[in-house]
Amino acid sequence: MPTIQQLIRNARQPIRSRTKSPALRGCPQRRGVCIRVYTTTPKKPNSALRKVARVRLTSGFEITAYIPGIGHNLQEHSVVSVRGGRVKDLPGVRYHIVRGTLDAVGVKDRKQGRSRYGVKKPK
């Protein structure tokens, strides 16, 4: 327990909360270039081949981002927009690629939950 004099000398520091998406530097989205597009397996008890991309952002960070939806057109040197949001069963993946912007096209034949996958309303 500190004395009153010690508290006067240097006050208590508030506990700073760490950001969950440091590479975005406080921005809602960031632009980046795909360095490598590949699949990876989730941790137990799940089993799949999750599509992810290694992205170099304009903020200088190099991150791993998840590619949501069924099928994609991304390859090396594709320019993508990245938002925050982790994938629970992929350790180290704390970002999502935004579908329907820049080089990432929307998901084909998607009818429900379209706004998340960059799909226009069908006629």
Swiss-Prot record:
NCBIfam families noted in UniProt: rpsL_bact
One Gene Ontology cellular component: chloroplast
Biological role: With S4 and S5 plays an important role in translational accuracy. Located at the interface of the 30S and 50S subunits.
Keyword Chloroplast applies: yes
Subcellular location: Plastid, Chloroplast
PANTHER family in alphabetical order: 30S RIBOSOMAL PROTEIN S12 FAMILY MEMBER
Assembly and interaction partners: Part of the 30S ribosomal subunit.
Keyword terms, alphabetized: Chloroplast, Plastid, Ribonucleoprotein, Ribosomal protein, RNA-binding, rRNA-binding
GO biological process: translation
Family named by the database record: Belongs to the universal ribosomal protein uS12 family.
A matching Pfam family: Ribosom_S12_S23
Record GO terms (molecular function): rRNA binding; structural constituent of ribosome
Keyword Protease: no
Chief subcellular location: plastid
Annotated protein name in UniProt: Small ribosomal subunit protein uS12cz/uS12cy
